[in-house]
């Protein structure tokens, strides 16, 4: 709905201009209409005064008709009220009314004034809404001032007729203009939709009335000038006095009727306010008309653009003609000025020639000094290059020495690994022997268990047999005791046998106890053998795991050393290539500088000191300044290259030192594994040992992450060193990023949402 808001804003601006025109008409009554005839260039004042003069001609007839009767004027006032109502409903400020005598009157409000302050609008609203009597006094004062402006002599009756009609026009003008101001005030508070269609009708009627007023201006102006210029005879003074009295009476009737009309207009304004409330409800229906009006507005805009184009073309033609005339007039003065300037230019050229010669001598001296400084700088750079080459050679020798040390350490590590492998094989052999012994002990334990079970079974059988014998003996004894016919000898023999049996029983019990003690001792021995075998197995397993772990650590350390050696070889190769490239580029640049210096020396020696024209001197001076600037830039570039080479050498020294330190730290070997094969080691946890792999412990993980970051940074530095365009691109990107951030921070203003005082 932005287009709808734009249309409403345009309509509101148009109504504001109409209200400001009415306010200027009320606040400035002393403005004379004769100024419109003296200023033909001001189109707005011409249209306004022409419309006012035509309205005076129209109101002259209305005043003559109002002198006939009051009823006729009241009917005219009613007609004006109806037509002002029609203009409010249509949203226009131009009124075309018809008097009872049939004279067609044109709109007199066809003017647009510049925008005034809000104080004038408030005064206008207070003036229109107030019902105080000073309004008529202001109107009478305005009528007297306008009559004085139109009739300075005060003797012609025809000059007074436009005065009365103009005063009446000024009285009736505000009665027409308050209606759009009231509608404007209501439209600000109620709806913007009803003003969209009214803006189009206002523009069309404004353009039509403007064309009509512009077409009628010459006739009305010629008629008014003829009326003002005609001399009146002295004999018609009495008739003019009578006409003046009649006109005064008619003016009094007009004033009273205008007051009545003002009251009626106020009532009509209140009714129009109610109608505006109903128009708000009809805003939805007006949307379709707005769509149709959009097409008409586009057509009108195209027509207006064509008219503006033609006006601009005509104005441009007029401007071209005026400029051509002014150019023709100014050519003579320009020629005179050019003659003076030519004389001054000759003097200035002669002085400039002397200054150029002095400057040439000074530049030659500066150039000789600059060439000497340049040769010194080139010599120092060559010395630094030789020093850098010597340093590179020293670094290469140190690298070869480090490589030989690495080879010796690697051989030592291989020998240690071989000894560890032999110790591992011995430990495995001992482990197999111990396993065999454990199996033998287990077999012995099984055999002893089976023997114990067999002895237990024999003991149980013997117990059963002895119990059976004892039971039979007891039965025999009991049977003998019961027998009374036994002899004493048999009784004595039975007692002896009984004693023997008891003695055997005791012996058997002792044997059983001995066998039980032997079984218990065998059980304890078997348990001791089992526990000893388990402990020995566990210890051998631990020793085997330790040996395997040490072997894996040695393999990992060897792999790390080999990778570090390969990386150092690659870095050394990169450094050698970089030094070779820098050496070649520096040699090429030194040759180029020497060639340029030789060319400049040849030019200076071969240059003939002959009299030459000023153009040649200026060209040579310009060439010398350019060469001097180039030499200065070359010196600055060489200085920056020198600093970069120094920085690169320092970085290479630091890298070599760090590489040596890393290799020394990586060459440490855990010598705890070199002890005797039978030695028992304690499993103490080691967190920061040098022999740990990169994947074991917190220290290994941290060292692995640091090594990856270091490798990435080294490769990035080598890439940036190898490609200068990448360095330039990174620097430009960072500079542009900071510049953009500064621009955004300095130019950013947060949005502030606030209500517009006019309702827009």
Curated annotation (Swiss-Prot):
Coiled-coil spans in chain: 249-668
Topology within the bilayer: Single-pass type IV membrane protein
InterPro entries linked: Golgin_subfamily_A_member_5
Cytoplasmic side: 1-727
One Pfam family linked to the record: Golgin_A5
Any GO MF annotation of the entry: protein homodimerization activity
Polar residues bias (residue ranges): 95-111, 148-166, 441-450
Entry protein name: Golgin subfamily A member 5
Organism expressing this protein natively: Danio rerio
Lineage: Eukaryota, Metazoa, Chordata, Craniata, Vertebrata
């Amino acid at each position: 709905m932005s287009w709808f808001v734009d249309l409403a804003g345009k309509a509101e601006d148009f109504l504001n201009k109409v209200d400001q025109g009415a306010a200027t008409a009320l606040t400035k009554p002393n403005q004379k209409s004769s100024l419109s005839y003296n200023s033909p260039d001001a189109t707005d004042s011409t249209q306004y005064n022409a419309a006012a003069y035509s309205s005076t001609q129209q109101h002259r007839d209305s005043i003559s008709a109002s002198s006939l009767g009051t009823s006729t004027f009241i009917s005219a006032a009613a007609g004006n009220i109806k037509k002002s109502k029609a203009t409010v409903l249509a949203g226009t400020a131009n009124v075309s009314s018809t008097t009872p005598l049939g004279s067609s009157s044109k709109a007199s409000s066809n003017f647009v004034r510049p925008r005034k302050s809000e104080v004038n609008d408030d005064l206008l609203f207070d003036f229109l809404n107030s019902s105080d009597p000073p309004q008529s006094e202001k109107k009478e004062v305005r009528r007297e001032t306008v009559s004085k402006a139109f009739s300075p002599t005060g003797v012609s009756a025809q000059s007074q007729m436009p005065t009365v009609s103009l005063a009446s026009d000024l009285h009736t003008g505000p009665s027409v203009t308050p209606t759009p101001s009231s509608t404007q005030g209501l439209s600000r508070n109620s709806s913007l939709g009803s003003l969209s269609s009214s803006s189009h009708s206002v523009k069309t009627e404004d353009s039509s009335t403007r064309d009509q007023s512009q077409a009628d201006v010459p006739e009305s102006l010629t008629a008014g000038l003829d009326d003002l210029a005609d001399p009146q005879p002295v004999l018609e003074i009495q008739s003019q006095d009578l006409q003046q009295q009649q006109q005064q009476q008619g003016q009094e009737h007009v004033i009273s009727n205008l007051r009545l009309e003002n009251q009626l207009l106020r009532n009509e304004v209140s009714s129009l306010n109610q109608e505006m409330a109903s128009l708000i409800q009809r805003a939805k229906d007006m949307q379709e008309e707005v769509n149709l009006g959009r097409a008409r507005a586009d057509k009108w805009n195209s027509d207006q653009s064509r008219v503006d184009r033609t006006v601009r073309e005509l104005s441009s033609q007029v401007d071209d003609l005026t400029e051509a005339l002014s150019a023709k007039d100014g050519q003579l003065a320009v020629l005179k000025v050019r003659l003076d300037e030519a004389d001054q230019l000759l003097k200035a050229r002669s002085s400039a020639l002397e200054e150029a010669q002095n400057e040439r001598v000074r530049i030659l001296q500066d150039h000789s000094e600059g060439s000497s400084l340049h040769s010194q700088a080139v010599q120092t750079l060559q010395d630094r290059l030789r020093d850098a080459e010597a340093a590179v050679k020293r670094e290469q020798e140190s690298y070869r020495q480090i490589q030989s040390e690495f080879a010796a350490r690697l051989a030592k590590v291989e020998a240690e690994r071989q000894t560890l492998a032999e110790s591992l094989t011995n430990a495995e052999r001992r482990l197999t022997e111990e396993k065999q012994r454990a199996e033998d002990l287990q077999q012995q334990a099984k055999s002893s268990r089976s023997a114990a079970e067999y002895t237990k079974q024999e003991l149980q059988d013997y117990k059963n047999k002895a119990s059976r014998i004892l039971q039979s003996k007891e039965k025999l004894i009991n049977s003998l005791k019961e027998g009374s016919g036994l002899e004493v000898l048999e009784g004595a023999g039975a007692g002896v046998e009984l004693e023997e049996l008891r003695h055997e029983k005791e012996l058997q019990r002792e044997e059983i106890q001995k066998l039980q003690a032997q079984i218990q001792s065998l059980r304890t021995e078997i348990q001791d053998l089992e526990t000893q075998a388990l402990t020995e197995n566990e210890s051998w397993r631990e020793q085997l795991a330790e040996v395997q772990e040490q072997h894996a650590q040695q393999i990992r350390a060897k792999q790390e050393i080999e990778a570090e050696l390969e990386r150092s070889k690659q870095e050394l190769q990169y450094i050698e290539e970089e030094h070779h490239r820098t050496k070649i580029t520096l040699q090429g640049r030194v040759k180029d500088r020497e060639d340029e210096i030789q060319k400049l020396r040849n030019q200076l020696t071969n240059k003939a000191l002959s009299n030459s024209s000023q153009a040649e001197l200026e060209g040579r001076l310009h060439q010398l300044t350019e060469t001097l600037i180039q030499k200065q830039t070359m010196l600055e570039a060489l200085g920056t290259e020198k600093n970069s080479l120094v920085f690169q050498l320092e970085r290479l020294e630091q890298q070599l030192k760090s590489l040596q330190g890393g290799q020394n730290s990586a060459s440490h070997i855990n010598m705890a594994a070199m002890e005797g094969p039978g030695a028992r080691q304690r499993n103490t946890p080691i967190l920061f040992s040098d022999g740990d792999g990169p994947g074991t412990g917190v220290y290994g993980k941290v060292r692995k992450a640091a090594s990856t970051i270091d490798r990435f940074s080294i490769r990035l530095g080598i890439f940036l060193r190898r490609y200068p365009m990448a360095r330039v691109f990174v620097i430009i990107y960072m500079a542009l990023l900071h510049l953009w951030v500064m621009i955004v921070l300095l130019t950013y203003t947060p949005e502030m949402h606030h209500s517009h005082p006019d309702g827009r």
